[in-house]
UniProtKB/Swiss-Prot annotation:
Homohexamer. Forms an RuvA(8)-RuvB(12)-Holliday junction (HJ) complex. HJ DNA is sandwiched between 2 RuvA tetramers; dsDNA enters through RuvA and exits via RuvB. An RuvB hexamer assembles on each DNA strand where it exits the tetramer. Each RuvB hexamer is contacted by two RuvA subunits (via domain III) on 2 adjacent RuvB subunits; this complex drives branch migration. In the full resolvosome a probable DNA-RuvA(4)-RuvB(12)-RuvC(2) complex forms which resolves the HJ. This is Holliday junction branch migration complex subunit RuvB. The lineage of its organism: Bacteria, Pseudomonadati, Pseudomonadota, Alphaproteobacteria, Sphingomonadales. One of its GO terms (molecular function) is ATP binding. Residues 183-253 are annotated as: Small ATPAse domain (RuvB-S). The RuvA-RuvB-RuvC complex processes Holliday junction (HJ) DNA during genetic recombination and DNA repair, while the RuvA-RuvB complex plays an important role in the rescue of blocked DNA replication forks via replication fork reversal (RFR). RuvA specifically binds to HJ cruciform DNA, conferring on it an open structure. The RuvB hexamer acts as an ATP-dependent pump, pulling dsDNA into and through the RuvAB complex. RuvB forms 2 homohexamers on either side of HJ DNA bound by 1 or 2 RuvA tetramers; 4 subunits per hexamer contact DNA at a time. ATP binds at L21, R22, G63, K66, T67, T68, R172, Y182, R219. It is found in: Cytoplasm. It comes from Rhizorhabdus wittichii (strain DSM 6014 / CCUG 31198 / JCM 15750 / NBRC 105917 / EY 4224 / RW1). DNA binds at R292, R311, R316.
């Protein structure tokens, strides 16, 4: 199973792209209060100066609204919006074509910007700093450098792996913004808003039940809401309340902490086979038949956030909360090093 096959994957799927549900302004956008407040100031200041907004870098876990915020920036600035992704820009010529087709003030959004090729980054540096392209025309002794002026534009980059962005590129973003996981209360508002736009009657306790299991991620909350809607229609429920939501999510094997079968396999492997750990990530990856990157970037962050596991120098260990969630008692020696205190 790949990560995108999981119902609780925060990665983007075609079914998640619903323009009708997407917030269109900072006022409609739920959560990320500090980021929204700062963006509102930066956008208003740029408008008053009659200038383009400084380049923006959004970083944080997937599914938190980086693409949506980029589109909102363009709308609030009254600018055009162009979107692409790092892997798509294979050659420097591809980037040059994108940049030369921008209109004055446009927003260029590059998702997965950490995956840009080094030669493409070299073209991006003068474009970001000087609004110019330095291109080599011709080959050999007759080759010459030509500088092409570009219109004012705002580059909005998005990444889930900030550490993989090179320092020269990262330093050229004037507005770096980290997006955080959502609280359950914020996700309840996201679910209620989406249900209203889908014409789906939902009780506050039903929205809260979905929010609790959405792993702090609006994209997952929206996906769970759609699946709960399917169950509600088939069951003939007039309204999605806590009972309907709980029954539906249990059928989907999403437990009360928002863990799915893959998460529980991971926890059970540490508990049942390695007596709570420590166990190395390569061993876990082999046992689960998953790449190491999937373990480190997809499975573990949420488990660490919940305090179910700990990453130590010796490997991964199950914490007290992890044992409790599995309904198991730790072996006698497990509590001696203090790793398993709740």
């Amino acid at each position: 199973m790949t990560d995108t096959d999981r119902l609780l994957s925060a990665g983007r799927r075609a079914e998640d792209v619903d323009a009708a549900l997407r917030p269109r302004s900072l006022d409609e956008f739920v959560g990320q209060q500090a980021a929204r407040d700062n963006l509102r100031v930066f956008i208003e200041a740029a408008r008053q100066r009659g200038d383009a907004l400084d380049h923006v870098l959004f970083f944080g876990p997937p599914g938190l609204g980086k693409t949506t915020l980029a589109q909102i920036i363009a709308k609030e600035m009254g600018a055009g919006f162009r979107a692409t992704s790092g892997p798509v820009i294979a050659k420097s010529g591809d980037l040059a074509a994108l940049l030369t087709n921008l209109e004055d003030g446009d927003v260029l959004f590059i998702d997965e910007i950490h995956r840009l090729q080094p030669q493409v980054e070299e073209v991006l540096y003068p474009a970001m700093e000087d609004r110019a392209l330095d291109l080599m025309i011709g080959e050999g002794p007759s080759a010459r450098s030509v500088r092409i002026d570009l219109p004012r534009f705002t580059l909005v980059g998005a990444t889930t792996r900030q550490g993989l962005i090179t320092t020269p590129l990262r330093d050229r973003f004037g507005i770096p913004i980290r997006l955080q996981f959502y609280t359950v209360e914020e996700l309840e508002r996201v679910v209620s808003r989406a249900a209203r736009l889908l014409d789906l009657p939902i009780a506050s306790d039903g929205a809260m039940e979905i929010a609790r299991r959405a792993r702090g991620t609006p994209r997952i909350a929206g996906r769970l809401l759609r699946r709960v809607r399917d169950f509600a229609h088939v069951l003939g429920a007039d309204i999605v309340d806590a009972k309907v939501a709980d029954q539906s999510l249990n059928r989907l094997e999403v437990d009360n902490l928002g863990l799915d079968a893959m998460d529980r396999r991971y926890l059970h492997m540490i508990a049942d086979i390695y007596r709570g750990g420590p166990v190395g990530v390569e061993t876990l990856a082999a046992g689960l038949s998953e790449p190491r990157d999937t373990i480190e970037d997809v499975i573990e962050p949420y488990l660490i956030q919940l305090g179910l596991i700990a990453r130590t120098a010796r490997g991964r260990c199950l914490n007290g909360r992890g044992w409790k969630h599995l309904g198991l008692n730790p072996p006698p020696e497990a509590g001696q090093d203090g790793l398993f205190d709740v």
